[in-house]
Regions:
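Walker A/P-loop-proximal flanking segment of P-loop NTPase domains
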Residues: 1, 24, 40-44
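Short glycine-/polar-rich loops that comprise or flank the Walker A/P-loop
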Residues: 2-3, 77-80
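A short hydrophobic beta-strand->loop->alpha-helix junction that borders the nucleotide-binding pocket
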Residues: 3-12, 85-87
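Conserved NTP-binding/hydrolysis module of P-loop NTPases
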Residues: 4, 12-30
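A Trp-anchored, charged/polar loop motif used as the substrate-binding/catalytic surface
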Residues: 27-40
C-alpha cells in the first residue's frame, strides 16, 4: 500500500498549508503538491493509499484539507485516512 503523509504541524500559516503538502512515493523528494494538484492525483489514484495527516494547534488548514479529502473519497474508495493528533 502506498502512503502519503501530510504534515500540517510544520506549516506556519494557512497559506503554507494550502501550497505545501506531502508527496507520494515515487515522486521527486522536492515535489510538494498544491491542494488542487493533490485533489486531481487522489481522484485518479487506482491503488490502495493510506493518507496520514498530522495536525498541530492550527486547525484551519486541517479543516480545508479534510473538506477536500471527503469530497475525493466520494469518488475514490481506494483511500484510507489516518489522522494523527499532535499538539505542537
Amino acid at each position: 500500500m502506498e502512503k502519503i503523509r501530510i504534515d500540517l504541524v510544520r506549516l506556519k500559516t494557512e497559506e503554507d498549508a494550502l501550497k505545501r503538502f506531502g508527496r507520494l512515493k515515487g515522486m521527486p523528494a522536492d515535489y510538494n503538491s498544491e491542494l488542487e494538484e493533490l485533489r486531481a492525483i487522489l481522484q485518479a489514484w487506482d491503488k490502495p493509499l493510506k493518507i496520514e495527516i498530522v495536525i498541530g494547534g492550527n486547525i484551519g488548514p486541517f479543516t480545508k484539507l479534510m473538506e477536500m479529502l471527503e469530497d475525493v473519497r466520494t469518488t475514490n474508495n481506494n483511500l484510507l485516512f489516518v489522522v494523527i493528533m499532535y499538539m505542537a
